[in-house]
Structures are given as structure tokens and as C-alpha cells.
């Protein structure tokens, strides 16, 4: 061995250091390269979300109502109930709590003062010296792109209903203020792309749901219960790792938390009653956790020994029950509170002990009502104010003087509008720096070859239509009118968009066709009528053909067809259709669907239930039929609507990998309330959750140009609150007696 200066060990050390530095730089460069390919814009639909327009409202109860339950007849009140809007018409705002600032800790109030609320608090105290301390509103808002917890000062001192003049003055003061609501995540470092929901305040601590920690297995909810202290600035996970909890409620003492949990069972895809268990544990650290009762959800503490919750009774009605969480007797059975004849759910207990607030569904509209615990009668509330609007998730103020809820702000009782526009596109917080995410007011978005335009199926028309808009949501134009879905832009002919023409979710024998729509990029802006023509590419009598996707060179289309009696994949000529060329790509007595062809022509991604009937996994296949293999499996769940990145190296898709993010009864109708967007590399590695939502996200499209939230257009449509309530509530029999305010 040759030595240098008689010190070989230093020579070796130098070589090792150089090698380490080289490999580190190489690995870092590779990681940066991999991260760099995850870029552009993913547009997608969130079912109904763009028309929710949720704001939080309260109704002040008359003072004599606090004595309700003394066995007298229905409460009679001479004046009309008044509703106060507590949030300010941005994005969607929901799941609130209203608490007196006198119950908040000094560290919390100091934080709010430092944030800029000091003058507002002092102003209210000066104006209302004899009133109770101002109230704090905790609520969830998506105003910054993801569901986050905010704390704000409501319109009036103590949440009291004021005269129109007084309320107008106060609203002006608040809206002209530069002080935004305080976002809870400001107390901690790191991104906030995940969901925070269902906040409750006790002392200096906020307890809430968060999806920040991934679950340990597919199809398990990421929901966990967390607490953030204003005194210590420390955030703790209270749920055990690997356990999914929903709908937390804090005891009046602040010592205990009760949750609805999937602990001890697997979620099997149910979207109505979840058969959760109610667990109680210490609010300080999650210790002393134990099961209270099986089959319950949405707990609400009335006092230290009474918790109300909902479940589906044996007679089929959603009903409210109560239980003593500290009664250790083995024969304790929950007591049914609300009678059969009306669906009652999402209870909110009052501190009076005489009544509870509940959501009900009697006909087709969800309302908030009061249930008298002694007379066993319902009292109308929101139906008297907005009879044709859905109202969600009631809450009761800490004084029990107000009942709150959230509803679409689109209309006043007199029919006038309270919202300026339902946006056409809206930014969503992305966990990846170079990747933009946007909601689209429609479905099946597809990007033009240069990424500057988006074709999509509009959701605001009486019948579906194909629209085209700019990437920022401006210059919307109607291209094709009729029942369309499953859009795909031609990669070489910028004026051609392929579409599925016909009804959705139909049998293999239904007539559904693939069409090529012309002049998609030059249609008249805001035209009243469609300005493009189309060409049928599939033959008459070939039954159900859907989801076209062009090859990277624009010569061929892959699509799903049921012409054989089973839904499999076929390839045809992109210009002249199957009349010129047709090739069957897959064959079997299963469903292969949602094909997407990579821009480099190498792979076709698709969803298939060939491994588990009715459950869909992600597959890849070469266009010549070779190389078929499964990329990801949700075992036994759903992976649907895959879409390649513009560079063909990654895939985005919708899946139930993260289970549910809320009890489905607490949100509007969703076809699949467990759908979120994920991406991965084409070999299945690098799986990343993109969206965190209690609503269904799906039908993604991926364009090559990123778009900042500040660049998005404010154009949209007139608000009309066009969304449905859940479809799993069925009317069974006659409704029980109810009362109303007069």
C-alpha cells in the first residue's frame, strides 16, 4: 500500500468524507428533482361545496324561555324571532361555539389583545357597561384555503340581538377594522393544509379535531382529538395513536372530554349511522380513557353527570338519548329522550337542564328545534325564520341565552341576497409548495394543452353543460349543452375536447356515447347558447361508452365501454372514432373504468374492481396490452378517477384511504363523503394526501401551470344555495306534537 506522508488513515478519512459529501449532494439533488416534478395545478370538484355559503347565525331566546319545562303548555312569544349573522360572508363558516370572555383565561385574552382585539373589546365594554362580558365566537372557516379554527368577536356584545341601526353601526365598525379573526394554528409552526374542526374552549385551552397525523392503515380516519393551550403554546394529541375520534365535547368543569370513536372496530364504508362508541377521557392529557356506551355519536354535556347523544333507534328513527358517563353499574342503559315520528340528531345541551337544541328532518328540509325535556314536545325555531333553508349543527351559548347554527347565507327571509357571488374557482391549501389546488364550480375539469384553459361540466344549470374558462376562473363560456361528463382535452388539437354524452351511473345497456366537441377554445365568452358543434366517435347500438382519454400524440382515445355486457377498456381512433379503428384493451367479468393516458404514451392508468367486486384499485397497463399491474389497493375500498401529471411521472386520484373526516349526518348530502385527493409516483411510492375535507372531493384534472390564490378571479354565479341534505334519512310514520313561537 502506498502511503502519503506516512499518514494513510487521514487519507482514508478524507476519501470517506468526500464520498459522503458526494452521496449527500446526489441524494439531495434527487430529492429536489422528485419534488420538482410535483408541480402545476390540480383542479377538482367538491360535491356541493361551492354553493354552501355557510355563515354562523344565532337567535336570542326570550327570557321567559329559560323557565321552559315547568309543565305548562307551549311557550307563546308575541314578537318575531330575530336572527343575527355572526360571521362575515367569506368562504364557508361552520361548527361554532359561543362562550363568554369571562370564562376565558388571562393568557387567551392577552393573546387576543396582542392580535388586535383590545380596542374592540374595550369599545364594547364602554358602550355596554351594564351588559355581560363580550362573547367569543369559535368557529371553523375555509377562508384561507383549508378548514381551520378561528376566534372572533361577534357582531353584538354578548351576542345580543340589537336594533337594525345599532347592528348596522357595529357591523360597519367590524368590517372596516383591519383586525382579522385569530387563527388557532398561529400558535404553532408548520403548514396548515390539514383539517381542524369542532372547536371547544375551556379556560386557556381549545380542544378540537385534527387530521394532521396520518392513520396507521388504509381506510382508517385520520381524525384525532387535540388540545392547544394559550398559556403554554403547547399542542397535544389526546387520542391514542392509531385511534380515530370524532365530535369532541368538553364537560362543564373542563376536566373531561367525550368523543365518538371507531376504537375497536373497522370502518366498512358506511355513510349513515357509523355505529361509533362513546369514550370519555381526561382533557389534560387523554388519560383514563374508557368506553361509556356503544352505538352513539355527537355527545353534548349538560352537566357533570348527563350527556346527550344521537343514535338510530330500533324503530328506525334518529333519536336523542342521554346517559350518565360516570354510572359504573353494569345494567345502565341509555334513556331515549326524543320520541319516534321525527328524526332528531346533533344535540346541543343547555345549562338550564330544561331543554336541548337539536337538528330535525321532518320533510325535505333540516331545521333546528328545541326539545322540552319535561313536556316532551318540540318547539319550532328556524322554520319560523327561514322555512326553506337547511340549518346545521346547533350550539347553545354558555349562558343558554342564544342558540346558534350555520346555514347558507344566500337569502334573507324576504328573498333578498346576502352574498355577492358563488365563486367559479377557489384556492385550496396545498401541502406541496409547487403544486396549486383549486375547487371548481363543476366537475370533470380538464386542462388545455398549454394549461391556460379549463373545460369542465357546469353545476349551475338546469341541465349539465360543458363550459370553458381561463385558468384563473375568468372569461367563462358555454361550449356544449346537454348531459355530459368525463371530459378530456386533446393534447395536440387545442380546439377539441372529448366528452361523454349521456346519463351518468347507468347500466351497460344504456345508450351513452363519446363525442368530440369542436371550437372549445374560441367559444364566445358568457354566451347564452352553446357555440360549438360535436362529432360522435362511437357507433349507435354500442351501449354505454364513457370516460375518453387521448394518447399523448393525439392519435387515439382509450375509453370505457359496456358493449360486451361488462365495462372494459377499448382504444379507438381519435379523429374518426371506432369506424376507423377499434381495439379491446382489457377483458373480464368485472369493471375497468376511468382510464387516463400518460402524455409520454407509455401507460394507461385506470380503476378496476377485478380483485374485489365492487371495490376499486389503481392499475397501469401499456397501450399494447402488456405490463398490466396493480399500483395501489385500498383493500377493500375505492381508488377512482386517476389522472397523470403533465410529465407522466405522478398520479392524482380520489380515494377513501383516509376514511371519514366527520360524522356524515353533520354535513350536506355527499355521494361518497369519504373521498379525498391523493398523489403518488407511478410506481406507487410517495403516497401523499392532498385534501382534508369532510366533503367528497373527486374528478381531478392536472395542468402544467401553477396559479396563486391571489391571481384567481372573483367571477362567479348568483348565490342560490343549491345543495341537498343527506339522502339516508327516511320518513317512517306520523310526527309527534310540536309547538312554536308565535
State each model region's role.
Residues 2-742:
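Sequence signature of WD/YWTD-type beta-propeller architectures
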Amino acid at each position: 500500500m502506498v502511503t502519503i506522508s506516512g499518514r494513510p488513515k487521514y487519507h482514508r478519512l478524507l476519501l470517506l468524507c468526500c464520498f459522503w459529501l458526494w452521496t449527500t449532494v446526489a441524494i439531495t439533488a434527487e430529492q429536489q428533482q422528485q419534488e420538482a416534478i410535483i408541480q402545476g395545478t390540480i383542479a377538482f370538484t367538491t360535491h356541493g361545496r361551492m354553493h354552501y355559503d355557510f355563515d354562523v347565525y344565532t337567535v336570542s331566546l326570550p327570557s321567559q324561555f329559560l323557565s321552559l319545562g315547568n309543565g305548562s303548555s307551549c311557550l307563546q312569544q308575541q314578537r318575531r324571532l330575530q336572527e343575527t349573522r355572526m360571521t362575515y360572508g367569506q368562504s364557508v363558516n361552520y361548527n361554532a361555539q359561543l362562550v363568554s370572555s369571562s370564562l376565558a383565561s388571562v393568557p387567551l385574552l392577552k393573546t387576543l389583545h396582542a392580535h388586535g382585539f383590545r380596542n374592540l373589546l374595550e369599545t364594547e365594554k364602554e358602550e355596554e357597561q351594564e351588559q355581560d362580558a363580550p362573547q367569543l365566537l369559535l368557529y371553523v372557516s375555509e377562508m384561507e384555503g383549508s378548514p381551520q379554527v378561528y376566534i372572533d368577536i361577534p357582531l353584538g356584545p354578548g351576542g345580543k340581538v340589537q336594533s337594525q341601526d345599532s347592528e348596522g353601526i357595529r357591523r360597519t365598525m367590524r368590517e372596516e377594522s383591519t383586525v382579522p379573526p385569530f387563527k388557532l394554528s398561529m400558535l404553532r409552526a408548520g403548514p396548515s393544509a390539514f383539517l381542524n374542526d369542532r372547536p371547544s374552549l375551556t379556560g386557556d385551552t381549545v380542544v378540537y379535531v385534527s387530521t394532521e397525523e396520518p392513520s396507521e392503515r388504509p381506510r382508517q380516519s385520520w381524525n384525532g382529538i387535540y388540545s392547544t393551550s394559550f398559556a403554554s403554546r403547547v399542542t397535544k394529541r389526546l387520542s391514542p395513536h392509531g385511534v380515530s375520534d370524532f365530535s369532541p365535547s368538553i364537560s362543564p368543569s373542563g376536566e373531561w372530554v367525550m368523543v365518538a370513536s371507531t376504537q375497536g372496530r373497522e370502518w366498512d364504508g358506511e355513510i349513515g349511522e357509523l355505529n361509533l362508541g362513546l369514550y370519555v377521557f381526561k382533557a389534560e392529557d387523554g388519560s383514563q380513557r374508557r368506553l361509556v356506551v356503544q352505538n352513539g355519536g355527537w355527545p353534548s354535556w349538560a352537566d357533570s353527570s348527563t350527556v346527550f347523544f344521537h343514535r338510530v333507534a330500533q324503530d328506525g328513527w334518529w333519536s336523542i338519548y342521554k346517559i350518565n358517563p360516570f354510572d359504573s353499574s353494569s345494567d345502565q342503559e341509555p334513556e331515549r329522550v326524543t320520541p319516534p315520528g321525527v328524526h332528531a340528531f346533533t344535540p346541543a345541551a343547555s345549562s338550564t337542564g330544561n331543554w336541548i337544541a337539536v337538528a330535525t328532518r321532518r320533510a325535505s328540509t333540516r331545521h333546528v328545534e328545541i326539545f322540552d325535556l319535561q313536556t316532551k314536545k318540540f318547539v319550532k325555531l328556524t322554520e319560523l325564520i327561514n322555512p326553506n333553508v337547511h340549518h346545521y349543527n346547533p350550539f347553545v351559548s354558555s349562558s343558554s341565552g342564544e342558540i346558534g347554527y350555520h346555514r347558507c347565507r344566500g337569502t334573507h327571509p324576504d328573498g333578498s341576497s346576502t352574498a355577492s357571488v358563488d365563486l367559479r374557482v377557489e384556492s385550496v391549501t396545498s401541502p406541496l409548495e409547487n403544486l396549486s389546488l383549486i375547487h371548481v364550480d363543476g366537475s370533470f375539469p380538464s386542462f388545455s394543452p398549454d394549461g391556460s384553459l379549463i373545460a369542465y361540466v357546469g353545476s349551475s344549470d338546469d341541465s349539465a353543460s360543458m363550459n370553458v374558462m381561463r385558468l384563473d376562473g375568468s372569461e367563462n363560456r358555454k361550449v356544449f349543452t346537454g348531459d355530459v361528463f368525463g371530459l378530456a382535452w386533446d393534447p395536440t388539437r387545442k380546439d377539441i375536447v372529448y366528452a361523454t354524452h349521456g346519463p351518468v351511473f347507468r347500466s351497460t345497456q344504456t345508450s351513452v356515447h363519446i363525442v368530440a366537441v369542436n371550437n372549445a377554445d374560441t367559444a364566445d365568452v358568457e354566451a347564452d347558447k352553446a357555440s360549438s358543434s360535436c362529432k360522435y366517435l362511437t357507433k349507435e347500438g354500442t351501449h354505454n361508452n364513457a370516460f375518453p382519454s387521448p394518447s399523448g400524440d393525439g392519435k387515439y382515445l382509450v375509453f370505457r365501454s359496456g358493449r360486451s355486457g361488462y365495462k372494459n377498456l377499448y382504444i379507438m381512433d381519435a379523429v374518426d372514432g371506432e369506424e376507423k379503428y377499434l381495439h379491446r384493451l382489457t377483458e373480464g367479468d368485472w369493471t375497468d373504468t376511468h382510464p387516463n393516458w400518460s402524455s409520454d404514451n407509455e401507460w394507461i392508468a385506470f380503476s378496476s374492481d377485478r380483485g374485489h367486486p365492487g371495490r376499486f384499485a389503481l392499475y397501469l397497463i401499456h397501450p399494447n396490452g402488456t405490463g398490466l399491474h396493480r399500483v395501489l389497493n385500498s383493500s377493500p375500498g375505492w381508488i377512482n378517477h386517476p389522472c397523470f401529471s403533465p410529465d407522466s411521472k405522478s398520479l392524482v386520484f380520489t380515494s377513501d384511504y383516509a376514511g371519514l373526516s366527520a360524522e356524515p349526518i353533520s354535513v350536506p348530502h355527499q355521494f361518497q363523503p369519504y373521498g379525498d385527493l391523493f398523489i403518488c409516483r407511478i410506481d406507487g411510492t410517495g403516497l401523499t394526501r392532498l385534501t382534508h375535507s369532510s366533503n367528497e372531493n373527486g374528478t381531478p384534472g392536472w395542468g402544467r401551470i401553477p396559479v396563486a390564490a391571489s391571481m384567481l378571479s372573483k367571477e362567479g354565479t348568483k348565490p342560490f344555495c343549491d345543495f341537498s341534505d343527506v339522502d339516508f334519512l327516511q320518513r317512517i310514520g306520523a310526527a309527534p306534537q310540536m309547538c312554536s313561537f308565535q
